[in-house]
């Protein structure tokens, strides 16, 4: 697809969020209006007709997915995200056809089948209609305006083919070229967008890199007017955050929210992460509710705190340190499933998406979708922070969680198990499959897609395909309960992808169910795995569900788990699963919470309406540490270069990081001496980083290096005094008339006063001083 875009004028930044309006784009006959923000084209040579898992022969183009509206033609759709100025309201969007032609293919577009959850429930409702003999009626659809970390994104669906019916004859029309036009006006008044007030070093460039691969008009990223925050000057010293989110003190990258009863264990995790160069703070819900502004309930109070932490501290990652009985989730009602009735979904997405308040209409229900002209609660599902949950209720469980994270990230160089992927895929439909039956959907299809499209081209990882049958796809071993338990117990796999049926307490593995008791009994030790479960409800953390039992296991099990809290719709869920693993294997996104959040962004345009993508967004959750660095190969051994020792006072500390003689760029390096100084940074292309380090007493500084597929390396650097060294410990202020002073005697320096300063000094170098003089 060819694309070009026009430059936007610089617009002053206004905080705000456009309403998530979902409006049908003007008809093709309407006179085009608005500013062209994007032009694109489709090439006839890129049209392919492929048979999908349901046996439908569908038209496809690169970068599209089928419009899965039951009972309507399954035309392809390309979902565009376009960057537009953040200070503007988007009032309308049109897709203008620039060139079309009659498609000569004799193929007809089949009708989409009902959506089917993995429990067999069918959803036949559609949000679009086929009327007037042309489908879709327009070449495109405006699906909403969203904010991600202060960047405004417009989502547009474009259809490269339309079906025409006239006189009983069906034909296809091909969209050769098109323009996206938007009418925008300066936003009046403020709107509710979370904005960075503290500058996070490196984040603007990092955000730009994400957007350049996400949006269809990446040329707009450079020079985009977005509030990055101010650089906060912090006094030299150890990590010293303020007591509550503010622009004072050290910045914070990782926020752990828990309860008073669990805080001591999570502080161990905070100390470990801080030593890696991820400055981390533990805050309890009791402290938040007692000392911070309260919302309508505890969930809103916690979200308000997270929003302040994002804006003022610079927080990017949040761990909800407690199960649903400790930190209650936000429940949202979704009427997409079942077709008659609705489902209450516990979603931690509420704590990650910080724009708006998820209750625009001010009633008792949060997270209501747009229905017709009613915009509902105008929820923006773009995640500003990357959230995970530690589903623990006791101090012992919290200790297990922390121990497992530390052990996983301390895996020795050369370990083989992180370099292997295990697939456990069964036939999804028919759900009562027996060997020899006709198969309408085999989970092995999704596994093979991942192997062929991602693992083989992007990694050197080994993989094991355990399938219920080899009727359609070759297996490496048959999937049975006994075989899966034995394989997991052996601890040979770092990533496990289960594709099949499931419920709160089980996942189906061909001939039997893998139950919570099986997860409890695993003994794979420190060889813990990431499990991504494409099944119904095994991630329902408001119950003692299967996925949380994997993570709670003290003798092995999983290091983290990703899955659905309620029903899952396999075809739709697979889009998100494939995108997650594409980011992990092919695009160097190795921190699990960030990877999960970014895997959802391409599909955000389909979330305003109460339909299958909104359902999937709300349902999938991460049970685990969101900062976890996921292994996708054997960890590399590191060689560190640093001074053999440091003196008291200011030191320039050059650090080099290499592997087998080659420099390692992008490694996170932290130098810390408790109570004295704390510095961290990332190595450049030459594998180097340098710190100004200011210890005030003798002792040891510790250098810690981590990164993508890098075995954690540490180096202790002694700090020894070369000469006596004085440290200022306090400064007395006298303004009461003594010592030549004049003032009001309150001990504060004020205008018009003459003050006497009395320093208190401590010799911290270990030497002897016979005299002291100063000027």
Task: Tell where the protein language model's regions lie, with residue ranges.
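N-terminal secretory signal peptides that target proteins for export/translocation
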Residues: 1-9
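Bacterial N-terminal signal peptides
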Residues: 14-23
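Cysteine-dependent hydrolase recognition
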Residues: 29-716
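Short structured motifs
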Residues: 140-141, 640-641, 741-745, 758
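Short, solvent-exposed loop/linker segments at the N-terminal edge
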Residues: 644-650, 737-740, 744-753
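Short beta-strand elements of extracellular/lumenal beta-sandwich folds
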Residues: 752-766
């Amino acid at each position: 697809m060819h694309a070009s875009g026009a430059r936007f004028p610089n617009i002053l930044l206004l905080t705000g969020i456009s309403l998530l309006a979902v409006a049908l784009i003007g008809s093709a006959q309407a006179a085009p209006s608005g500013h062209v923000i994007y032009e694109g084209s489709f090439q006839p040579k890129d049209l392919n007709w492929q048979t999908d898992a349901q046996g439908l022969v569908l038209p496809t183009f690169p970068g599209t997915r089928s419009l899965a509206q039951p009972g309507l033609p399954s035309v392809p759709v390309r979902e565009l995200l376009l960057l537009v100025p953040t200070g503007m309201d988007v009032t309308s969007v049109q897709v203008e056809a620039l060139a079309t032609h009659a498609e000569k293919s004799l193929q007809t577009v089949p009708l989409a089948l009902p959506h089917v959850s993995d429990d067999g429930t069918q959803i036949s409702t559609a949000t679009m209609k086929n009327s007037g003999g042309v489908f879709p009626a327009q070449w495109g659809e405006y699906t909403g305006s969203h904010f991600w970390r202060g960047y405004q994104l417009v989502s547009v669906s474009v259809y490269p083919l339309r079906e025409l019916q006239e006189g009983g004859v069906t034909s296809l029309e091909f969209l050769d070229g098109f323009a996206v036009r938007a009418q925008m006006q300066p936003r009046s008044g403020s709107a509710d967008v979370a904005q960075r007030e503290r500058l996070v070093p490196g984040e603007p460039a990092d955000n730009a890199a994400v957007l350049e691969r996400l949006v269809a008009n990446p040329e707009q990223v450079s020079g985009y007017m977005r509030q990055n925050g101010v650089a906060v000057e912090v006094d030299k010293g150890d990590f010293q955050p303020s007591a509550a989110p503010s622009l004072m003190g050290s910045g914070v990258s990782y926020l752990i929210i828990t309860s008073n009863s669990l805080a001591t264990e999570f502080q161990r995790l905070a100390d470990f992460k801080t030593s890696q160069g991820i400055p981390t703070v533990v805050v309890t819900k009791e402290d938040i509710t007692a000392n911070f502004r309260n919302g309508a309930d505890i969930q809103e109070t916690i979200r308000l705190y997270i929003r302040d932490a994002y804006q003022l501290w610079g927080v990017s990652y949040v761990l909800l340190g407690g199960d649903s009985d400790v930190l209650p989730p936000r429940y949202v009602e979704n009427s997409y499933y079942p077709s008659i009735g609705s489902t209450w979904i516990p979603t931690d997405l509420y704590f990650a998406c910080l724009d708006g308040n998820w209750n625009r209409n001010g009633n008792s229900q949060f997270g209501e979708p747009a229905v017709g002209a009613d915009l509902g609660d105008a929820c923006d599902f773009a995640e500003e922070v990357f959230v995970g949950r530690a589903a623990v209720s006791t101090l012992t469980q919290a200790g297990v969680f922390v121990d497992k994270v530390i052990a996983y990230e301390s895996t020795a160089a050369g370990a083989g198990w992180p370099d292997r992927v295990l697939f456990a895929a069964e036939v999804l439909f028919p759900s009562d499959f027996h060997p020899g039956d006709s198969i309408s959907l085999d989970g092995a299809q999704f596994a093979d897609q991942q192997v062929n499209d991602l693992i083989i081209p992007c990694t050197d990882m080994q993989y094991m395909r355990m399938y219920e049958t080899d009727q359609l796809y070759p297996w490496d071993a048959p999937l049975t309960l006994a075989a899966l338990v034995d394989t997991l117990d052996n601890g040979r796999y770092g990533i496990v992808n289960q594709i099949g049926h499931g419920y709160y307490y089980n996942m189906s593995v061909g001939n039997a169910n893998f139950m919570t008791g099986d997860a409890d009994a695993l003994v794979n030790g420190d060889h813990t795995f990431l499990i991504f479960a494409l099944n119904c409800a095994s991630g329902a953390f408001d119950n003692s569900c299967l996925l949380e039992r994997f993570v709670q296991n003290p003798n092995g099990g999983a290091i983290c788990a990703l899955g659905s809290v309620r029903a899952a719709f396999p075809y739709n869920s697979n889009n998100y699963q494939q995108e997650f693993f594409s980011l992990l294997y092919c695009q160097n996104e190795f921190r699990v919470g960030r990877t999960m959040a970014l895997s959802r962004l391409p599909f955000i345009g389909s979330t305003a309406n109460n339909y299958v993508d909104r359902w999937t967004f709300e349902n999938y959750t991460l049970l685990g540490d969101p900062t976890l660095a996921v292994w996708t190969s054997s960890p590399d051994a590191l060689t560190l270069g640093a001074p053999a020792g440091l003196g008291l006072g200011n030191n320039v500390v050059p650090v080099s990081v290499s592997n087998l003689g080659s420099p390692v760029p992008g490694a996170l390096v932290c130098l810390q001496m408790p109570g004295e100084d704390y510095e961290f940074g990332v190595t450049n292309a030459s594998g180097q980083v340098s710190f100004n380090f200011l210890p005030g007493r003798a002792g040891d500084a510790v250098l810690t290096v981590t990164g993508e597929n890098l075995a954690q390396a540490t180096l202790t650097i002694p700090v020894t005094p070369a000469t006596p060294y004085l440290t200022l410990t306090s400064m007395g202020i006298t303004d009461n008339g003594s010592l030549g002073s004049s003032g009001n005697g309150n001990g504060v320096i004020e205008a018009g006063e003459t003050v006497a300063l009395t320093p208190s000094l401590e010799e911290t170098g270990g030497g002897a001083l016979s005299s002291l003089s100063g000027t």
